[in-house]
From Swiss-Prot:
Species annotation: Chlorobium phaeovibrioides (strain DSM 265 / 1930)
HAMAP family documented for this protein: CH60
Stated name of the protein: Chaperonin GroEL
Biased composition, class Gly residues, residue ranges: 538-547
Protein family: Belongs to the chaperonin (HSP60) family.
Annotated ATP binding sites: T30, L31, G32, P33, K51, D87, G88, T89, T90, T91, G415, D496
EC class: isomerase
Length: 547
């Protein structure tokens, strides 16, 4: 086992503070509309330029082990806030640094760290309650665009695109962000349910120009096993042909004799048919087949449920106004399922999302939800260089996440003003002793820090003067760092999602409290391994004359 080095109390906390400050100072220059860019060296490829706090935080790795532990703890604040709310990472970092700095002063003066932590926790609880009180819900396209603009580092084009996408697919709809082939950034909306499986044979194509199979007023057969024998498929195929309507077959796979027979009948014109593999794998495939069945008013033919393919009747088939397939995707538009069943299924999936503990499962459930409730919007992000495209794509993803947060929990006034207004909530915090009271005062001081930093990044105005001016104001009145004017910030479009502000404070206080109550740090002792000796001139013995 490697030998360990242990550092205690004041020495440990001082070193942790150096690490916290190094990371926080690199991150906080990006805060606000006047925030600066940070250039990050990449071992392979061009350097990355970013104004995204969490991207900067993730790149910081310090040489000293204990300093690095301090930096990594604050990095966790930024990452957690980004994961939960999509924005507010820089605010969270600034708050964590301020809480730790003020807390350390009091620990050095003899305050008990555990009571400081209890005071901080009580203060945060009251501030969060006050934030919820001053929060207002958003619904309009204009308000959504404002949130998107702020979260995309004041890029109105991105804000408008996100508002447009939410307008098209609804607030529960799936919005994906992809890299465009050209320089233009555009929104594309896929209506209906789309899944990533294309036709099994190009012979099913009905439009040879676009290489698509288009089925109007289609019947849909949904089967959860492989079909290789024509005998089991024939009865339902004959019933479908008698109706004169095109038939889409969705199954785990269709191969051999069954696929060949379908292709031959399609080419002869005796049968309008197309076959496609079922989407997903395992339990997710079963769930998606059930979704398709509910959307189209059909039944999944499954032996687990007691249904056999050879006994299937036309009543088992789903229906849709249009189905279009290319080699990669299948889109079902206007399924004929009942609204009651679709709504019940949507509520069931929402319940699963609430209980889900995995980000991956949550994402897949949200995709299923969107496909049932309104479609998918794709934001194709264009830029003139790869560096710009990556930076812009990261901003769009953050803005999208933050906009969803705003729809969930509402908005508060931006520009650091909401935290100033929420200081009022600290009057309700009841400490049990003086050290807890000090913990509450630490939060009071820390809540001013984001506004101070936003002003500092403008480089033209004194933060203390602005702070007093804003404190003397009321409601939405604050300092607009973009125009450097005092005005009603909500009317000026300077707003933050409540979830972002709340998460930033909760995560910052949590990590800063852990750091304050840390009494020892344990790290590996670095081994001094001697450098490899240089090779003697002339190479190894017996290699004379080699070049």
């Amino acid at each position: 086992m490697t030998a360990k080095d242990i550092l205690f109390d004041a020495d440990a906390r001082a070193k942790l503070k150096v690490g916290v400050d190094k990371l926080a100072n690199a991150v906080k220059v990006t805060l606000g509309p006047a925030g600066r860019n940070v250039l990050i060296d990449k071992k392979f490829g061009a350097p990355t330029s970013t104004k995204d706090g969490v991207t900067v935080a993730k790149e910081v790795e310090l040489e000293d082990a204990i300093e690095n532990m301090g930096a990594q703890m604050v990095r966790e604040v930024a990452s957690k806030t980004s994961d939960v709310a999509g924005d507010g990472t820089t605010t969270a970092t600034v708050l964590a640094q301020a809480i730790y700095r003020e807390g350390l002063k009091n620990v050095a003066a003899g305050a008990r760290p555990i009571d400081l932590k209890r005071g901080i926790d009580r203060a945060v609880k009251e501030v969060v309650a006050e934030l919820r009180t001053i929060s207002r819900s958003i619904s309009g396209k204009k308000e959504i665009a404002q949130v998107g603009t702020i979260s995309a580092n004041n890029d109105p084009e991105i804000g408008e695109l996100i508002a447009e996408a939410m307008d098209k697919v609804g607030k529960d709809g799936v919005i994906t962000v992809e890299e465009a082939k050209g320089m233009d950034t555009e929104l594309k909306v896929v209506e209906g349910m789309q899944f990533d499986r294309g036709y099994l044979s190009p012979y099913f194509v009905t439009n040879s120009e676009s290489m698509e199979a288009e089925l109007d007023d289609a019947l849909i057969l949904i089967y959860d096993k492989k079909i290789s024998n024509m005998k089991e498929l024939l009865p339902i195929l004959e019933k479908g042909a008698q109706s004169g309507r095109p038939l889409l077959i969705i199954a785990e796979d269709i191969e051999g004799e069954a696929l060949a027979t379908l292709v031959v009948n399609k080419l002869r014109g005796t049968l309008k048919v197309c076959a496609v593999k079922a989407p997903g794998f395992g339990d997710r495939r079963k769930a998606m087949l059930d979704d398709i069945a509910i959307l189209t008013g059909g039944t999944v033919i499954s032996e687990e449920k007691g249904y056999k393919l050879e006994n299937a009747t036309i009543n088992y088939l789903g229906q849709a106004a249009r189905v279009s397939l290319d080699k990669d995707n299948t889109t079902i538009v206007e399924g004929k399922g009942t609204q009651e069943e679709i709504k019940a299924r949507i509520n069931e999936i929402k319940g699963q999302i609430d209980k889900s503990t995995s980000d991956y499962d949550t994402e897949k459930l949200q995709e299923r939800l969107a496909k049932l409730s309104g479609g998918v919007a794709v934001l194709n992000i264009g830029a003139s260089t790869e560096v710009e495209m990556k930076e812009k794509k990261a901003r769009v993803e953050d803005a999208l996440h933050a906009t969803r947060a705003a729809v969930q929990e509402g908005i508060v006034v931006g520009g650091g003003v909401a935290l100033i207004r929420a200081i009022k909530g600290l009057d309700n915090a009841k400490p049990d002793n003086d050290d807890q009271k000090t913990g509450i005062e630490i939060i009071r001081r820390a809540l001013e820090e984001p506004l101070r930093q936003i002003v500092a990044n403008t480089g033209t105005t004194d933060g203390a003067v602005v702070l007093e001016h804003v404190k003397n104001g009321e409601g939405d009145y604050g300092f607009n760092a973009r125009t450097e004017q005092y005005e009603n910030l909500v009317e000026a479009g300077v707003v933050d999602p409540t979830k972002v502000t709340r998460s930033a404070l909760e995560n910052a206080a949590s990590v800063a409290s852990i750091l304050l109550t840390t009494e020892a740090c344990i790290t590996d002792i670095k081994e001094n391994t001697p450098d490899m000796p240089a090779m003697p001139p002339g190479g190894m013995g017996g290699m004379g004359g080699m070049y």
